[in-house]
Swiss-Prot record:
Cofactor(s) demanded: Ca(2+)
The protein's name in its UniProt record: Phosphoinositide phospholipase C 5
Organism whose genome encodes this protein: Arabidopsis thaliana
Key word Lipid metabolism present: yes
Keyword match Transmembrane: no
PI-PLC X-box domain residues: 112-256
Top-rank lineage group of the source organism: Eukaryota
Membrane-topology annotation of the record: Peripheral membrane protein
Gene: PLC5
Length: 578
């Protein structure tokens, strides 16, 4: 039997004797305060600046920055509207360290090189971006598109189909029972929210089931709605993708070139080079009905009309899609004449990495590779994203309306680089080593770096959970799981002891992680309430890119199962690299 937090608080006077004391600073915090104040009761801006440089490794911080921190903390804690006191006491210092606004665990600004071609970046990518729930009969809507863009997703997918009278365009999941949404509504919402979270380009992946006249209509819609936001590539196709910096505030179209387009001679010399293919045809699981219908539509096209229509539509396509119809090896062949996108369902991608792992990585050094969930994931679950990232796949497409550890990893990866939706791939994935070999994620590699993680304490569950699944009669017994996900040799999970009967658990435990590929590693953090004999209650999670961790004592905010911020729920942790 479960009950909400309010009913739990009413039972605080019971014999359970719940410990509700406000957490005192850990000894490491006290020691640092004493050391940098030289034993005095207050810390000056100069002393705080020294602490930030020497302990927090913030080498570019100035005394003026420390003064702003002191002013902010003083105003918040003591309600001083005028900056009269220029120092922090121990409690103020502790409050600063526990502030995820002022002392966040990773850099909140874009800091990576954004001037390389798109193929050099992992791109925050959504699958069936318009679905509100499962893949069978959930409603199609522009709301999931808006949510994804606000979260920082940079690549969206729209499935375009003719309406029943063949004179307008709907967005829906084909061969299912999903109530459709009008394309025009989706495009307007994309325009309005495209750059809410990031200035870098939105890639619109179109799965095209339209006749030439409707393709032309779609092109006119996009030009009319997006106006100067839409990016027009150079005539004849690209030799190399533009950079995210080049494409700032632009919407980039990716789909199959229409049949008979000017790109045909160049891009369709073989199926591997971009012959008319949507994500559906990039998989040999196509149904006979689907293949037959596509052929009938093509055979029924009016050639005179389509010659005019494809000029309008194909002019918008920056990233032509390819397929694996003639086999994986041919699909992964590098075409020195241009660049393209290849889309593979997760099972076919797994097969590709098992048979042609080296070719996959070489392909992604120049081209884009998109992976999407298998058809049996009707509940909108997701696969492990590292399966794609380890082989350089830029567009690991996820069902953003789902939840679970795979989605937590996705959120974690793209908290990196200021949450802009583009994360630079490590140099070793883009360049061959001295022996001319590409990166092999299955190889046994030497330890490159050691990460020490100390979990001090947590707070906020008493106010952060409006309703909770904590056990009715037992007080919270929180513990934290800390681990690494990444290449096979780096994967590990550890956990703290259970902290008995308290809303503000204090663990003060340290863990050490030896990493062979820290550039691809994520730090996983989960908090649970021990609930024997039932299943332990989930109490918060986060994932953080190891390469982005800021050294020192940091405030780490936690999120719910769907990746939404748990208001006030925070851990105090310390990170140190050896």
């Amino acid at each position: 039997m479960k009950r909400d937090m309010g009913s739990y608080k009413m039972g605080l006077c019971c014999s359970d004797k719940l410990r509700m004391n406000r957490g005192a600073p850990p000894q490491d915090v006290v020691t640092a305060f004493v050391e940098y104040t030289e034993g005095r009761s207050h810390m000056t801006a100069e002393q705080l600046c020294r602490f930030l440089v020497e302990v927090q490794d913030e080498t570019e911080v100035l005394v003026s920055d420390a003064e702003k921190i002191i002013e902010r903390i003083t105003c918040e804690r003591h309600h001083i509207t005028k900056f009269l006191r220029h120092t922090l006491n121990l409690d103020d210092f502790f409050s600063f360290l526990f502030s995820d606004d002022l002392n966040h665990p990773i850099d909140s600004k874009v800091h990576q090189d954004m001037a390389s071609p798109l193929s050099h970046y992992f791109i925050y990518t959504s699958h069936n971006s318009y679905l509100t729930g499962n893949q069978i009969n959930s409603e199609c809507s522009d709301v999931p598109l808006i949510k994804a863009l606000k979260r920082g997703v940079r690549a969206l997918e729209l499935d375009m189909w003719p309406n029943s009278t063949k004179d307008d365009i709907l967005v829906l999941h084909g061969w299912a029972w999903t109530p459709p949404v009008e394309l025009v509504k989706c495009l307007r919402s994309i325009k309005e929210h495209a750059f809410y979270a990031s200035a870098y380009p939105v890639i619109l992946t179109l799965e095209d089931h339209l006749t030439p006249d409707l393709q032309a209509k779609a092109a006119e819609m996009m030009k009319e709605i997006f106006m100067d936001m839409v990016y027009f590539p150079e005539a004849g196709g690209l030799k190399e993708f533009p950079s995210p910096e080049d494409l700032k505030y632009k919407i980039v179209i990716s789909t199959k070139p229409p049949k008979g387009s000017l790109r045909k001679d160049k891009d369709s010399e073989s199926d591997a080079s971009g012959k008319a293919s949507s994500d559906v045809s990039a998989d040999d699981e196509k149904t006979e009905e689907e293949t037959s219908e596509a052929k009938n539509e093509e055979d029924g096209f009016d050639q005179e009309s389509s010659n005019l229509d494809f000029l309008t539509y194909s002019r918008l396509i920056t990233i032509p899609s390819g397929n694996a119809k003639n086999g994986l090896k041919e699909a992964l062949t590098i075409d020195n004449g241009g660049v393209r996108r290849l889309s593979l369902r997760e099972q076919k991608f797994k097969k590709a990495t098992e048979m042609y792992g080296t070719e996959v990585i070489k392909f992604t050094q120049k081209n884009l590779l998109r992976i999407y969930p298998k058809a049996t994931r009707v509940n909108s679950s997701n696969y492990r994203p590292y399966n794609g990232w380890m082989y350089g796949a830029q567009m690991v497409a996820f069902n953003m309306q789902g939840y679970g550890r795979a989605l937590w990893m996705m959120h974690g990866m793209f908290r990196g680089n200021g949450g802009c939706g583009y994360v630079k791939k490590p140099d070793f994935m883009m360049n061959n080593n001295l022996s001319g070999e590409v990166f092999n994620p299955k190889a046994k590699l030497p330890i490159k770096k050691t990460l020490k993680v100390k979990v001090y304490m947590g707070k906020g569950w008493d106010s952060g959970f409006q309703r909770t699944c904590f056990n009715t009669w037992s007080s919270p017994n929180f513990y934290t799981r800390v681990g690494i996900t990444g290449v096979r040799g780096d994967k590990v999970m550890k956990k703290t002891k259970k902290e008995q009967k308290t809303w503000e658990p204090f663990w003060n435990e340290e863990f050490e992680f030896q990493l062979t590929v820290p550039e691809l590693a994520l730090l996983r953090i989960e908090v649970h309430d021990y609930n024997m004999p039932e299943k332990d209650d989930f109490s918060g999670q986060t994932c953080l890119p190891v390469s982005e961790l800021r050294q020192g004592i940091r405030s780490v905010p936690l999120y719910d199962r769907k990746g939404e911020r748990l208001v006030s729920v925070t851990l105090l942790m310390r990170f140190h690299f050896l």
